[in-house]
């Protein structure tokens, strides 16, 4: 392409300060350096994490910043040493790297990478490239990256270990969802919770991640899937995707965990918390059965005070586990998930409620914050 080796000017949505609305600006995107790839983003989606970051509810984030981490695009150019992609390839940028060298990447027990193994402040990870500089500038000032992806920019630069090459015929307006929400929820049920055929499950939170977890539970063969959300308007879609029961805690006269225990005659086999608040986490654990109940934490809620538990809650046989990116070995697994989508093994289309031009990103955030959307796709 004629832009190879040159600075590209394009539009991006910048968060100049914490708690302030995004501003669409013209930014300069520098050429990729060694082991870096510059991508033209075709489609990007909104995730609640992006909104949480913009609202300054994550500690350690540096501003100004270009957020966004759920997208798909086309390789524009590559830096020296890049061998896994070439210009023109369709790709999905990934906040979960795979270096293939560290003890985490070499272990079958985890999908973490040493690059981000310290997740005390996840939003502050990968805000600069390997040489500790940014590839973005605006109005003469450097602009920070986000999660190593920064997909709210028409062009972005990522490390070659944060990138999955996908099939040439992939629909980028759908497979962009594999960059975070779907992969996280679906994988949590299959890879982390390891939901079993005939089991009973409870999924707390029916946003994009929660609905994906419902699909994962169904794919794993669960016989009963209880969806829980404070927005009853989400129940129709949840049932269409596999939920057998739906409960709104605000409509109940006793705690949700007590209701679930009564419904299931003792508690569910698997609970998946896709909301992340302290009360929801506790309810998810409490609604699991004694003996073998499993609770998987997926969501990270801003301002959560954590979870207080007592030993006797676990010594009766319950287990707690967490998930990062649904347990997928990112760069290796995403191409396979793209193929599975093409083969209709799961339904990404059902998660897409709106498609808007990128310039209407503020409208997309309003839809999400008002609970009127599941996933909105923004097109450049």
Swiss-Prot record:
Predominant location category: cytoplasm
Cofactor(s) in the UniProt record: Zn(2+)
Keyword hit for Iron: no
Annotated residues for binding of Zn(2+) 2: 99, 102, 105, 113
Gene Ontology BP, a term: retinoid metabolic process
Binding-site residues for Zn(2+) 1, renumbered to this chain: 47, 69, 180
Pfam families, per the entry: ADH_N, ADH_zinc_N
Cofactor, free-text remark: Binds 2 Zn(2+) ions per subunit.
Phosphoserine found at: 121, 278
Annotated compartments: Cytoplasm
Role: Catalyzes the NAD-dependent oxidation of either all-trans-retinol or 9-cis-retinol. Also oxidizes long chain omega-hydroxy fatty acids, such as 20-HETE, producing both the intermediate aldehyde, 20-oxoarachidonate and the end product, a dicarboxylic acid, (5Z,8Z,11Z,14Z)-eicosatetraenedioate. Also catalyzes the reduction of benzoquinones.
Subunit structure, interactors included: Homodimer.
Protein's name in the database: All-trans-retinol dehydrogenase [NAD(+)] ADH4
Gene from which the chain derives: ADH4
